[in-house]
A protein has these predicted regions:
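Conserved P-loop NTPase motor core of helicases/translocases
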Residues: 62, 70-99, 174-179
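A generic structural signal for alpha->beta connector loops
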Residues: 31, 60-63, 185, 212, ...
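Short, well-ordered alpha-helices that flank and scaffold nucleotide-derived cofactor binding pockets
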Residues: 19-26, 49-53, 175-182, 203-210, ...
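P-loop NTPase Walker
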Residues: 1-82
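Conserved helicase motor core of SF1/SF2 NTP-dependent helicases
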Residues: 8-11, 39-42, 195-242
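Short, hinge-like loop/turn segments at secondary-structure boundaries
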Residues: 53, 82-84, 232-236
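Conserved phosphoryl-transfer catalytic core
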Residues: 86-110, 212-224, 240-242
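Accessory N-terminal region flanking or inserted into the helicase ATPase core
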Residues: 1-7, 15-16, 33, 105-190, ...
Length: 242
């Protein structure tokens, strides 16, 4: 069963989800059978804090599945921070390829990628949109400073760099999660801040909810704050018709 909860900011969508969490816990659903995934770490943490305080639970042990999607993939794949692409790795990659990279990192708060290098930004955005890189390039406007062939070569070189160093980025984690044969089965699944999810994240959400008894998805169908990072609000809106 899937329930969609829509509304603009401040209309109580998250409060509705939190009240539902309370109800299911009161009804005897075990905390570890509840998945609560949000776009931002802040929202997931607030949900876990409320449930832990109200029911005397330990966040780490009793509520391990109140997370962001990239954090859940990280956890399920048994990753460590040392295996993740970091600022120094991107800097080394830039030096190796002869391109300037002052800033390049994924946010631990919401999983978005930020870089001062437009090539890396385009490579990342194509990945979260699940688009062929060159097709995405061709669909863009006002990127005259980006050379098509250079973009493709840098993308291939970045793949080799990560393979050689056995490193992953947040997009790789979700793609690897999608390839897993199994995932946790939840009695109840909550998805908050749904309007900000990318198509790549929606594929992960669909895999998780395919094994959930009940699913509640909340978001604002009129606004996506993270469109610049690949948020696919149209996919969210289309859920109402399914």
């Amino acid at each position: 069963m899937k329930t969609i909860i829509l509304g603009p900011p401040g209309t109580g969508k998250t409060t509705t989800l939190l009240n539902l969490v309370d109800e299911f816990l009161k009804d005897g659903i075990r905390p570890r059978q509840i998945g609560y995934f949000s776009f931002t770490k802040k929202a997931a943490t607030e949900a876990a804090d409320r449930a832990a305080d109200k029911f005397g639970l330990d966040k780490e042990n009793d509520l391990p599945f109140f997370r962001t999607l990239h954090s859940y993939a990280f956890n399920q794949l048994g990753m460590t921070k040392e295996k993740m692409m970091g600022r120094d790795d991107y800097k080394e990659f830039g030096e190796k390829c002869g391109i300037p990279i002052k800033t390049a990192k994924f946010s631990n708060e919401d999983g978005t990628f930020n870089s001062d290098n437009e090539y890396l930004t385009i490579i990342n955005t194509a990945a979260v949109k699940r688009m062929d890189l060159l097709e995405y390039y061709d669909s863009r406007k006002n990127i005259l400073d980006i050379e098509r062939n250079t973009l493709f070569l840098l993308s291939e070189e970045l793949k080799r760099f990560k393979e050689e160093k056995k490193l992953k980025d947040f997009n790789d984690l979700i793609e690897d999660f999608l390839l897993k044969e199994t995932s946790n089965k939840f009695e109840v699944l909550f998805i908050d801040e749904a309007q900000d999810l990318s198509l790549l994240q929606w594929e992960m959400v669909r895999k998780i909810w395919s094994r959930a008894e009940k699913t509640y998805i909340a978001g604002d169908d009129d606004q996506a704050i993270f469109k610049w990072a690949g948020a696919d609000v149209d996919h969210f809106i289309a859920l109402k018709e399914e």
